[in-house]
């Protein structure tokens, strides 16, 4: 998908925003994430055309009750992403070396603590976690929903501060020997807000002896006049050049 039509000319979507697209897959729902590259508003048509760039390389399953498009209002990092490396000591003496922190025991894959407090992330909202695959190192995306939100003070990895802990319907991915550098690769898109879609306009003129309407209209009968409004297609006819003698 490279473009969308949104209802209303004054849409609250701007270039650079992330959009989560949820679509049916037959037995459930799949999701993908896109970035807005262009917004073209039309006050006359009361809608906006949005062009999109692909971020997630493939769709992933998500727990949802309906299809929809959501703008992700917050893009944040997990707590500890900016922690300095852990200094190494022996018998209380600094050895002059540093190493990566082991993941704290509280770092369950069903929980994720953000690096700052966010009161606008709500239960049942969507969340997208982008991270390195701990096995291959390639980028991967996890699509889920927030099942609980807790605001708390956190002290880990030589840092202390306020954070927001999310309980997740679908956990992020780690290995038994994963370290803090895995969280450093992670970006979390949250605070989802549904946006209304508009019908895709016809890119060709209305013509012919039949006309399909978008809904059932009571009272239509043979012989009743109809009025069709819109711009008339302009056609320029070029006369052929005379044949040379």
Description of each model-found segment:
Residues 1-245:
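Intrinsically disordered, low-complexity, polar/charged repeat-rich segments
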């Amino acid at each position: 998908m490279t473009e969308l039509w949104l209802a209303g000319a004054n849409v609250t979507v701007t270039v650079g925003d992330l959009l989560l697209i949820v679509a049916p897959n037959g037995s459930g729902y799949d999701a993908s994430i896109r970035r807005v590259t262009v917004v073209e508003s039309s006050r006359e048509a009361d809608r906006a055309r949005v062009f999109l760039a692909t971020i997630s390389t493939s769709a992933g399953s998500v727990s949802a009750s309906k299809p929809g498009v959501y703008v992700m209002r917050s893009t944040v990092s997990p707590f500890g992403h900016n922690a300095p490396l852990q200094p190494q000591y022996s018998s209380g003496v600094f050895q002059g070396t540093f190493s990566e922190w082991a993941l704290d025991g509280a770092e369950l894959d069903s929980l994720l603590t953000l690096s700052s407090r966010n009161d606008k992330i709500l239960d049942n909202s969507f969340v997208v976690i982008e991270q390195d695959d701990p096995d291959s190192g390639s980028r991967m995306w996890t699509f889920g929903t927030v099942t609980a939100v807790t605001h708390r003070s956190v002290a880990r990895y030589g840092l202390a501060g306020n954070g927001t802990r999310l309980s997740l319907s679908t956990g992020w991915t780690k290995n038994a020997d994963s370290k803090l550098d895995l969280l450093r690769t992670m970006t979390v898109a949250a605070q989802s807000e549904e946006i209304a879609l508009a019908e895709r306009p016809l890119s060709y003129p209305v013509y012919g002896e039949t006309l399909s309407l978008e809904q059932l209209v009571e009272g239509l009968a043979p012989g009743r006049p109809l009025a069709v409004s819109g711009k008339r297609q302009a056609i320029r006819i070029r006369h052929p050049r005379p044949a040379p003698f």
